[in-house]
């Protein structure tokens, strides 16, 4: 890897990058902090080269691997990790050792669900989120065409929303 990569250490750095290279993303401080914290929690850091291209570095090892890693992939993997952590917290709170254990995992679960809402909004702005909405709309349009009933236009909205809710609630696709 020949490119010199500058790793982000603060949410403001990610926001500054987005303001220049991905203005539609428009992350808040909290959004950027969530992305950076999840990456750090999984032993990765993200950064950019002098052209603004984003990279991911494995920070678990000295001189860890650096690879091109677009922001859409960052958001997607963070959504997946969030989903896995929600499942883990849900399992622990469903079978706690004691009341303190329950409270700990309930608090963790609520925090992860709050992260999920922010991540879902970010995911919708990615190429993956846009593609999912297009697929859902196309599917709904086909259903309406096959049934031939104009009254069923409401079905299109329902199906599109259902697919969207399913996909954002079921990370790890």
Model regions and ranges:
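Hydrophobic, Leu/Ile/Phe/Ala-enriched alpha-helical segments that form helix-helix packing faces
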Residues: 18-22, 35-43, 163, 167
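Short, extreme N-terminal segment that most often corresponds to the first beta-strand
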Residues: 1-21
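Short, aromatic- and cysteine-enriched interfacial helices/patches
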Residues: 23-25, 122, 146-147, 167
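Acidic, low-complexity, intrinsically disordered interaction modules
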Residues: 25-133, 139
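Non-Sec secretion/translocation targeting segments of pathogen effectors
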Residues: 168-173
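Composition-driven recognition of long, low-complexity, acid-poor segments enriched in small hydrophobic
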Residues: 129-147, 151-166
């Amino acid at each position: 890897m020949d490119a010199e990569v500058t790793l982000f250490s603060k949410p403001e750095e990610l926001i500054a990058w987005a303001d220049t290279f991905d203005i539609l993303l428009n992350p808040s401080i909290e959004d950027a902090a969530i992305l950076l914290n999840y990456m750090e929690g999984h032993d990765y850091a993200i950064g950019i080269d002098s052209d603004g291209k984003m990279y991911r570095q494995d920070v678990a090892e000295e001189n860890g691997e650096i690879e091109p890693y677009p922001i859409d992939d960052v958001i997607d993997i963070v959504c997946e990790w969030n989903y896995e952590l929600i499942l883990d917290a849900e399992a622990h709170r469903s079978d706690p050792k004691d009341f303190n254990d329950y409270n700990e995992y309930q608090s963790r679960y609520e925090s992860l669900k709050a992260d999920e809402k922010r991540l879902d909004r970010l995911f919708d702005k990615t190429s993956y989120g846009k593609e999912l909405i297009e697929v859902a709309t196309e599917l709904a349009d086909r259903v309406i065409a096959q049934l031939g009933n104009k009254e069923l236009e409401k079905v299109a909205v329902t199906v599109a929303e259902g697919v969207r809710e399913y996909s954002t609630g079921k990370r790890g696709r």
